[in-house]
Amino acid sequence: GVPSIYAIGDVTNRVNLTPVAIREGMAFVQTVFNANPTPVDHDLIPSAIFTQPEMGTVGLSEEAAAEIEPIEVYATTFKPMQSSFAGRPDRVMMKLIVSQATRVVLGCHIVAPNAGEMIQLAGIAVKMGATKEDFDRTVAVHPTMSEEMVTMKTPTRKT
């Protein structure tokens, strides 16, 4: 590298998301202009695709996690109340990927209306190393789609 040339955001080809570029820019300012070395953690960044329905993801996929260690998968699909009331066929999918050994939630995946909103909050829990039991101890907000994240009690499959 050249000492006087810096790069952040998409040009680095690390994680091509606007909030990552903003975080990298702020870290650059802190490091270079405030003499406060500030690394950016590029692990476990939640992301969403704003299609219809939305898709949100954070952490490892089922396939990636299974290559690393034995896992449990908690998955559900259901018709959300808003679709039922409107007579629409829309369905929701939610999945938690859990380490069998440590019980840490390794990944969370949502396909649903407002999945981007839900995955942002799930991302905090996953980033903090929450366990499946931490999710289970959380009281659900009812009636919501996201309550399924804390009410899935039986693994769908183990690998």
State the predicted function of each range:
Residues 1-44, 102-103, 144-145:
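Rossmann-like dinucleotide/flavin-binding elements
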Residues 33, 50-61, 66-159:
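Flexible, glycine-rich terminal cap/loop adjacent to redox cofactors
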Residues 45-49:
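Helix-loop-beta segment of a Rossmann-like dinucleotide-binding subdomain
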